Amino acid sequence: MSKIIDILEKEQIRTDLPEFGPGDTLVVQVKIREGNNERLQAFEGICIAKRNRGIGSSFTVRKISHGEGVERVFQTHSPLVSSVTVKRRGDVRRAKLYYLRALQGKAARIKEKLEKKASV
C-alpha cells in the first residue's frame, strides 16, 4: 500500500522550483481566485523557515507591510504557488529565523551571502 502512495507522491512533486533556504529574500507568485477570475499575486519577503517532508514540504515567508509583520506559510508543491524566485541570498547560521519576529527596523536585516570567486 505504501508503494502506491510513494508513486502518487512522486508524480506530484515539483522540480521547477529553485534552491532556497532560510534568510533568502523570495518573491512567491500565488494564484488568487476572485469569483470567476484568477490572477497572480506577488508575496515578497524573507524565508524564515523551511520544512522538508516530501509532498508535505512547506516554507514560511515574512514581510513587513505598512509597519505590521505579515507571515504566510506556503506548501512547496501546491498548484496555487505559481513560481518562486530568489531575489537575494541571506547569510544566516540558523535553520529557523523566528527571532526576527521580535526585531524591528535595521536590527531585522540579514547579511547578504557573497558568491565565492574561482581562483585563477
Swiss-Prot record:
It comes from the Bacteria. GO terms for cellular component: cytosolic large ribosomal subunit. Keywords: Ribonucleoprotein, Ribosomal protein. GO terms for biological process: translation. Gene3D superfamilies: 2.30.30.790. One of its GO terms (molecular function) is structural constituent of ribosome. Belongs to the bacterial ribosomal protein bL19 family. NCBIfam families: rplS_bact. This protein is located at the 30S-50S ribosomal subunit interface and may play a role in the structure and function of the aminoacyl-tRNA binding site. This is Large ribosomal subunit protein bL19. It comes from Dichelobacter nodosus (strain VCS1703A).
